[in-house]
Amino acid sequence: MGIKHCCYILYFTLALVTLLQPVRSAEDVEEFLPSANETRRSLKACEAHNIIDKCWRCKADWANNRQALADCAQGFAKGTYGGKHGDVYTVTSDKDDDVANPKEGTLRFAAAQNRPLWIIFKRNMVIHLNQELVVNSDKTIDGRGVKVNIVNAGLTLMNVKNIIIHNINIHDIKVCPGGMIKSNDGPPILRQQSDGDAINVAGSSQIWIDHCSLSKASDGLLDITLGSSHVTVSNCKFTQHQFVLLLGADDTHYQDKGMLATVAFNMFTDHVDQRMPRCRFGFFQVVNNNYDRWGTYAIGGSSAPTILSQGNRFFAPDDIIKKNVLARTGTGNAESMSWNWRTDRDLLENGAIFLPSGSDPVLTPEQKAGMIPAEPGEAVLRLTSSAGVLSCHQGAPC
C-alpha cells in the first residue's frame, strides 16, 4: 500500500471520529475552564453598591486579609484603623460569667485589653452580656464569617479612640445595675447603672460602626455624646425602636459644638419612631439613607446644628399629620428657621415634606475632607440594599 493511500485512510478515519463526537455547548466547554467559570459566578454574586462596600466586599480573600477593612472607612471616621496594628484575637467562648475578671477567650476579655486587637469569632454565637461591655481603644470587633448576636447589655465606648464595630447584631438590650466591671488591663472599676443603649459612645473619637443591625433597647439604639467626634455610622439597619440615633444628649453639653458625624447608607425601617438622627450643636452629613416610614419624625435637632441632608429617600408614613421629615425643638420658630438644615437631591415619597432652613454653609477644610459624595435619592434602594449584618463565607466575596 502506497504512502498516499495510507494518508487518505487516516484522513477519513479522523473525520469520522470527529463527526461521531457530541456537540458541546458553551456551558459544556466551561466545565474544562473552572477558573473562568468560578470568576463569573463570583462577579455575579458580588453586590457592592456604595463607596464603602466597594472597597472590600468583592474580594474573595477578605477572610485572609481582614484588617484591610480598616482602609475602607469614609466620612468623618475616615482614617479610623481600629485594631489594625495589633494581633488578631479569636473569641472562642460566648460566656460572660465574670464581668470583673473575664476569662481568656471571651469577648469581654479581648475588649478590655490595653493593646490593639482585631477581634473575630470562632463560630456562631449569642453572647448574653450580664453587664455593659466596656470597649478599650484600638479595637475592631469583626463579626464577618459567622453570626454574632449580642443581647441583654450593650456596648460602651467611653473616652476611647479608634474603634471599629462591624457585622454585629445587637438587640433586646436591658438596663443593667452596674458594679465592678473590667474596662482595661488594670483592676475592674465601679460602673453605675447603664442606660440600656445598644451602643453608647461618649467622649470618644475615630469611631466607625458599619453593617450592624440594631433593635429593641431600653433607651437608645445608638447614642453619641459628650464631645465625641469623627464618627461614621454606615450600612446599618435600625428597626423596632423609638429612640434610634442621638448625636448630642443635652442642650447644655457645649462640648458637642465640635462634633463631626456622618450617617450614610443606613436603613431605618420596621417600626422606628424618631431620632434618625437627633442632632445638637455639631456638623452632620446625612447622606444616601433609606427612611421607610417613621412614627413621629425622621431627622430632628436643637441648639443650632448644621445638618446636610443629601440624596436620602424619605418615604413618609400614611398618616397625614406625620408627613414632615424634620422636627426642630428647644426654641422659637424664627430662631430655628435660621439653622442650616439643607436638602440636596433628597427623594420625597408618599407625601413626605422637607422644610429646609438657613443657607448652604461655607465648609472648613476638615468638613470638606470628611464629606461623602452623594448620589441622588433615586439610587438609595440600591445603595442600601445590603444594610445591616451581612452573610459572609470564607473564600467568596461577601
From Swiss-Prot:
GO terms for biological process: pectin catabolic process. Disulfide bonds join 55-72. The N-terminus is blocked. The active site is at 275. Pathway: Glycan metabolism; pectin degradation; 2-dehydro-3-deoxy-D-gluconate from pectin: step 2/5. Residues 1-25 form the signal peptide. Keywords: Allergen, Calcium, Disulfide bond, Glycoprotein, Lyase, Metal-binding, Signal. Pfam families: Pectate_lyase_4. Pollen and flowers. Its cofactor is Ca(2+). Ca(2+) binds at residues 195, 219, 223. Binds 1 Ca(2+) ion. GO terms for molecular function: metal ion binding; pectate lyase activity. Glycans are attached at residue 37. It catalyses: Eliminative cleavage of (1->4)-alpha-D-galacturonan to give oligosaccharides with 4-deoxy-alpha-D-galact-4-enuronosyl groups at their non-reducing ends. Its EC number is 4.2.2.2. InterPro entries: AmbAllergen, Pec_lyase, Pectin_lyas_fold, Pectin_lyase_fold/virulence, PEL. This is Pectate lyase 1. It comes from Ambrosia artemisiifolia (Common ragweed).
